Amino acid sequence: MPASTKTYRPETRLVHSGTLRSQFGETSEALFLTQGYIYPSAEDCEARFSGKIPGYVYSRYSNPTMSMFEQRMAALEGAEAARSTATGMAAVTTALMGLVRAGDHVVAAKALFGSCRWVIEEWLPRFGVTSTLVNGIDLAQWKKATTRNTKVFFMETPTNPTLEVYDIAAVADIAHNAGAKLVVDNVFATPLYQSPLTLGADCVVYSATKHIDGQGRVLGGVILGSEKLILDHYHQILRQTGPSLSPFNAWVLLKGLETLSVRVQRQTENAGAVANALAGHKKVTRLIYPGRPDHPQAETIRKQMRAGSTLCSFEVKGGKEGAFRFLNALELIGITNNLGDAKSLVTHPTTTTHQRLTPDQRAELGIGDGLIRFSAGLEHADDLIADLLTALEKV
């Protein structure tokens, strides 16, 4: 971005922040597809490795293309620092592992992506870290679950796939009063619709695989927070364990950021149109969309989000059998477990993202056998609605 004292708006930062041009002055950011770097002297090599002078030493540690992506994400999020990872789950796992050690305790909302819940319930205990899962809406449960060893609060909001929205500022206050840090998975909101750091969160994580790429091409993740948090808790983990984002994927994600605002705007319009079209449909028993006034957390949404969502969820009659009949009748919309794509996609959480949970656990989270998660793409809303309504006739 040009040197200036101006504060640019998010749409401008998405296009210009972090740009590092080579001596050739290319208009499109360069892809530095290299493992290592040549040093002008042995002394320079020693100084770079010791950290006495800045510079790249190995692309597992950092890379100019990765740096451009990280700087652009930090500018968009309003964070002091960002670090990229190979996947969203690498970002989540690193964000949690970097804040705990044996004997520590984590409090997390129950409504989590299946892999996130596995990390908390199955992986962290192998290293002596215990956890308590709570109803994220109930602030009293966050307080009650806190112990003297609690070091981390973790939530995703809006949640996957029920689109619950938690009060980030209120939970951050509880965490900080307990001496803990709050980590927020902000993937469903995107940096454009929700800013957890300004609401009191200490760390924000993303699966860049979703909206940031936006076209179903590559995997990636991001961890954002203060410079001190990143250096004290994550720098060495990322450097030594190697969950590194590839330079090629960083370049694809960097280019994806340029169109994020226009894509998310169109996707949100489509998701809202679909939600309104399905509301009250005789084959739909439940509809959840953060942009509608009937959302259970509508007040929280108005307080902390700038718009609704690119996703909506709805439950069809007939349980799993009804859901499968609906899914198999779709002609335009694809069945997959991804989201945030240019193409509209649907998922059956019971048999995919949340399959490992027991029926009772899914029921507790509001994930019925007939629940469908819809991720809006860039198609014309009328075509999407027509496909959905036609498929509902098969239920």
Where are these regions (language model features)?
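Conserved small-domain helix->loop->beta segment predominantly found in fold-type I
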Residues: 272-341, 357-363
